[in-house]
Amino acid sequence: MLGAIIGDMVGSPYEFHPWQGAAEAFPLFSPCSRFTDDTVMTVAVARGLMRAYGQEQACREAFIDAMHEYGRAYSRAGYGQRFFRWIVTGSREPYNSFGNGSAMRVSPVGWACDSLEETERYAALSASVTHDHPEGIKGACATAAAIFLARDGAGRDAIRDYVSFRYGYDLARSLAEIRPAYRHKESCQESVPEAIIAFLEGRSFEEAVRNAVWLGGDSDTQAAIAGSIAEAFYGGVPQDLREAALARLDDRLRGDVAAWYHWLSEHRGIRLDRKADPVQEQKTAVSATGRDIMETMPKAGMTGQWETTVEEGLLAAQVGSGEVRVLATPMMIMGMERAAMEAVRPCLPEDMTSVGTRVDISHMAPTPCGMKVRFEAKLTAVSANGRGLTFAVAAYDEVGPIGEGTHERVVVDREKFQSRAQTRGKHE
């Protein structure tokens, strides 16, 4: 929580007045540094968890109640127009937002939960009470997942690889590449990846926060997100920054912060007695969760195969790709695709699948009806975000090779992909 609060305060003076100098040159705290809606709603999420963690429906209601309660108590914290209307009207219905408010407040979830899957589930729950757009939910889940992984001991590469693969964010860019054209962005898809990159490029808690502010844009929220991940990664926050942040909170919020860390210790068995050093070396050990992620994500060398017997329905004369009774080229391609699917199927989450995007093959020999055929695929390259897959594919009948080439696939969210396809089907 304190990582997000410090980031919020450090970034607050620069939200609409971007810092133009070097990242290490601006003062972390100044007379203009203050807490904003990022801090208030982070505390609200923590309160919701303390009241009802373990009962998901009750926790959803607790999130709503706490957001209303704290939103009204701190009505001038700088909320977005739609969220403020949601607060003052007492609405309990979401409004399809994909703003980064869902990600800025989610950090307590990354600490409260016992597993990565539970973390993502509760992150979605905390987001969906207002930000029920898929991008709003994704931003919260990606942030909370990064926090959980960092807290669990995963290194930067494991965090980058998982978030890139699971949520499709491009984390291969550098801040130096992003900054020249970057503007004030408040959507999850245009600010959460950048905040995560700010953390990834930092070599200390302070550097992570400075990076997020130096980038420009929605600096307080980006720094809150980067700071929340950095707190988990470095095992706490530097003592001087902790004291400076607490001094800028009122008595109620200071009490809430203390209550949260006490709850983590007493009810979740998590202690943060050690404050992070100003500079800490990059982690070299890989956590069990990190190892699991790296072992299950698609990686070059994975293989798959599929076998069948050439029957009437696979013949060129039957499918319309020719007039002879041999294995049709489209059916050979289908077999190669099936083998490629089998190569990566075991490592994909249940809600994800792969779809073919390109084939470049040679059909070298005819295979008559009744003959057995075997299709093989080997994953030869994976894109930076883990979703673009290139395979070497081959086909064999009982005599020998009958086809070879390359095949490309992309990993997609099954439900979202199907929804887009149905939308195209309604086009007139």
Give, region by region, the residue ranges found by the protein language model:
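C-terminal output/interaction extensions
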Residues: 403, 408-428
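Hydrophobic beta-strand-centered segment that forms part of the acyl-chain substrate-binding groove
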Residues: 341-374
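Hydrophobic beta-sheet segments that form the core/acyl-binding groove
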Residues: 361-398
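Intrinsic-disorder/low-complexity, polar/charged segments enriched in Ser/Thr/Lys/Arg/Asp/Glu/Gln
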Residues: 299-305, 331, 358, 372-374, ...
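Short coil/turn motifs at secondary-structure junctions
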Residues: 313, 341, 380-384, 396-400, ...
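Structured, active/binding-site neighborhoods that engage oxygen-rich ligands
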Residues: 1-292
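Catalytic strand-loop segment that frames the active site of acyl-thioester-processing enzymes
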Residues: 294-328
